A protein has these predicted regions:
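Generic low-polarity alpha-helical segments
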Residues: 4, 36, 53-54, 123, ...
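Accessory terminal helices/loops
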Residues: 70-76, 84-154
Protein backbone atom coordinates (compact mmCIF):
# COMPACT_ATOMS: atom_id res chain seq x y z
CA UNK A 1 0.00 0.00 0.00
CA UNK A 2 1.54 3.27 -1.11
CA UNK A 3 -1.23 5.51 0.12
CA UNK A 4 -4.21 4.86 2.36
CA UNK A 5 -7.34 6.40 0.85
CA UNK A 6 -9.74 8.53 2.84
CA UNK A 7 -13.08 10.18 2.16
CA UNK A 8 -13.17 12.31 -1.01
CA UNK A 9 -9.64 11.43 -2.12
CA UNK A 10 -9.21 11.71 -5.88
CA UNK A 11 -7.33 9.27 -8.04
CA UNK A 12 -6.46 10.67 -11.46
CA UNK A 13 -6.61 7.94 -14.07
CA UNK A 14 -5.38 7.79 -17.62
CA UNK A 15 -7.14 10.31 -19.85
CA UNK A 16 -7.70 12.68 -16.92
CA UNK A 17 -10.60 10.60 -15.63
CA UNK A 18 -11.10 10.94 -11.88
CA UNK A 19 -12.04 8.20 -9.44
CA UNK A 20 -13.28 9.43 -6.05
CA UNK A 21 -12.87 7.39 -2.87
CA UNK A 22 -15.90 7.62 -0.58
CA UNK A 23 -15.88 6.22 2.95
CA UNK A 24 -18.92 3.98 3.48
CA UNK A 25 -18.21 2.13 6.73
CA UNK A 26 -20.71 -0.14 8.40
CA UNK A 27 -20.38 -3.47 6.63
CA UNK A 28 -16.75 -3.23 7.64
CA UNK A 29 -15.10 -0.39 9.53
CA UNK A 30 -12.78 0.78 6.78
CA UNK A 31 -15.03 0.22 3.78
CA UNK A 32 -14.37 2.49 0.83
CA UNK A 33 -16.65 2.86 -2.18
CA UNK A 34 -15.76 4.56 -5.45
CA UNK A 35 -17.43 7.08 -7.74
CA UNK A 36 -16.39 7.14 -11.38
CA UNK A 37 -18.32 9.59 -13.54
CA UNK A 38 -22.00 8.58 -13.11
CA UNK A 39 -21.26 5.21 -11.49
CA UNK A 40 -20.98 4.49 -7.75
CA UNK A 41 -19.26 1.20 -6.85
CA UNK A 42 -20.78 0.60 -3.40
CA UNK A 43 -19.41 -2.83 -2.50
CA UNK A 44 -21.26 -4.33 0.48
CA UNK A 45 -22.60 -1.01 1.79
CA UNK A 46 -26.30 -1.87 1.42
CA UNK A 47 -27.93 -4.78 3.28
CA UNK A 48 -30.28 -6.47 0.81
CA UNK A 49 -33.66 -8.07 1.47
CA UNK A 50 -33.48 -11.84 1.15
CA UNK A 51 -29.78 -11.94 2.03
CA UNK A 52 -28.04 -12.16 5.40
CA UNK A 53 -27.50 -8.64 6.76
CA UNK A 54 -23.83 -8.31 7.65
CA UNK A 55 -22.38 -5.19 9.23
CA UNK A 56 -20.24 -4.33 12.24
CA UNK A 57 -21.58 -0.89 13.18
CA UNK A 58 -25.29 -0.07 13.16
CA UNK A 59 -24.87 3.71 13.21
CA UNK A 60 -22.16 3.73 10.54
CA UNK A 61 -24.22 1.58 8.16
CA UNK A 62 -27.13 4.02 8.51
CA UNK A 63 -24.80 6.99 7.90
CA UNK A 64 -23.38 5.27 4.82
CA UNK A 65 -26.89 4.60 3.50
CA UNK A 66 -27.64 8.32 3.89
CA UNK A 67 -24.40 9.20 2.10
CA UNK A 68 -25.23 6.89 -0.82
CA UNK A 69 -28.79 8.24 -0.99
CA UNK A 70 -27.49 11.83 -1.08
CA UNK A 71 -25.71 11.11 -4.40
CA UNK A 72 -28.82 9.96 -6.27
CA UNK A 73 -29.06 13.19 -8.29
CA UNK A 74 -25.48 12.91 -9.61
CA UNK A 75 -25.21 9.14 -10.00
CA UNK A 76 -26.99 7.04 -12.60
CA UNK A 77 -25.78 3.54 -11.66
CA UNK A 78 -24.99 1.95 -8.29
CA UNK A 79 -22.91 -1.24 -8.44
CA UNK A 80 -22.98 -3.45 -5.32
CA UNK A 81 -20.57 -6.33 -4.83
CA UNK A 82 -23.19 -9.10 -5.02
CA UNK A 83 -26.64 -7.83 -5.95
CA UNK A 84 -27.91 -6.49 -9.27
CA UNK A 85 -27.11 -2.99 -10.49
CA UNK A 86 -29.33 -0.25 -9.09
CA UNK A 87 -30.31 2.92 -10.92
CA UNK A 88 -31.28 6.41 -9.87
CA UNK A 89 -34.91 5.29 -10.18
CA UNK A 90 -34.70 2.39 -7.71
CA UNK A 91 -31.88 3.30 -5.30
CA UNK A 92 -34.20 5.06 -2.82
CA UNK A 93 -36.38 1.93 -2.53
CA UNK A 94 -33.32 -0.30 -2.07
CA UNK A 95 -31.99 2.00 0.67
CA UNK A 96 -35.41 2.21 2.34
CA UNK A 97 -35.52 -1.60 2.40
CA UNK A 98 -32.00 -1.67 3.90
CA UNK A 99 -33.00 0.83 6.59
CA UNK A 100 -36.02 -1.36 7.39
CA UNK A 101 -33.71 -4.37 7.80
CA UNK A 102 -31.49 -2.44 10.23
CA UNK A 103 -34.50 -1.09 12.14
CA UNK A 104 -36.13 -4.53 12.34
CA UNK A 105 -32.99 -6.01 13.91
CA UNK A 106 -32.74 -2.98 16.20
CA UNK A 107 -36.31 -3.41 17.46
CA UNK A 108 -35.68 -7.12 18.03
CA UNK A 109 -32.52 -6.25 20.00
CA UNK A 110 -34.42 -3.77 22.18
CA UNK A 111 -37.11 -6.35 22.97
CA UNK A 112 -34.59 -9.14 23.61
CA UNK A 113 -32.39 -6.97 25.85
CA UNK A 114 -35.39 -5.98 27.97
CA UNK A 115 -36.13 -9.66 28.52
CA UNK A 116 -32.58 -10.76 29.31
CA UNK A 117 -29.17 -9.09 29.44
CA UNK A 118 -27.12 -12.22 28.64
CA UNK A 119 -25.58 -11.88 25.18
CA UNK A 120 -26.08 -15.52 24.13
CA UNK A 121 -29.70 -15.56 25.27
CA UNK A 122 -30.28 -12.20 23.58
CA UNK A 123 -28.78 -13.45 20.30
CA UNK A 124 -31.05 -16.49 20.31
CA UNK A 125 -34.10 -14.36 21.16
CA UNK A 126 -33.34 -11.86 18.38
CA UNK A 127 -33.19 -14.70 15.86
CA UNK A 128 -36.54 -15.98 17.18
CA UNK A 129 -38.17 -12.53 16.93
CA UNK A 130 -36.87 -12.15 13.37
CA UNK A 131 -38.04 -15.69 12.55
CA UNK A 132 -34.50 -16.56 11.45
CA UNK A 133 -33.35 -19.31 13.82
CA UNK A 134 -30.98 -20.60 11.13
CA UNK A 135 -28.82 -17.48 11.61
CA UNK A 136 -28.21 -18.08 15.31
CA UNK A 137 -24.84 -19.74 14.62
CA UNK A 138 -23.87 -17.71 11.55
CA UNK A 139 -20.64 -15.93 12.57
CA UNK A 140 -21.16 -12.88 10.36
CA UNK A 141 -24.79 -12.40 11.38
CA UNK A 142 -23.67 -12.69 15.02
CA UNK A 143 -21.43 -9.64 14.38
CA UNK A 144 -24.47 -7.78 13.06
CA UNK A 145 -26.46 -8.62 16.19
CA UNK A 146 -23.54 -7.59 18.41
CA UNK A 147 -23.49 -4.22 16.61
CA UNK A 148 -27.07 -3.69 17.79
CA UNK A 149 -26.46 -5.00 21.30
CA UNK A 150 -23.45 -2.71 21.75
CA UNK A 151 -25.40 0.23 20.38
CA UNK A 152 -28.24 -0.36 22.85
CA UNK A 153 -25.88 -0.80 25.81
CA UNK A 154 -24.06 2.49 25.05
Amino acid sequence: VDHRLKDNDKIVLEGNHILYAIETPGHSLGEISYIFEDAFFIGDSIPVKGDIPIYVDKNKILESLDKIKSTKNEIQYFYPAWDKTYTTENIEKVIKDAEEIVNEIDQAAIIALKENNDVEVTLKRICQILNKPMLEKHPLFIKTVYAHILSEKN
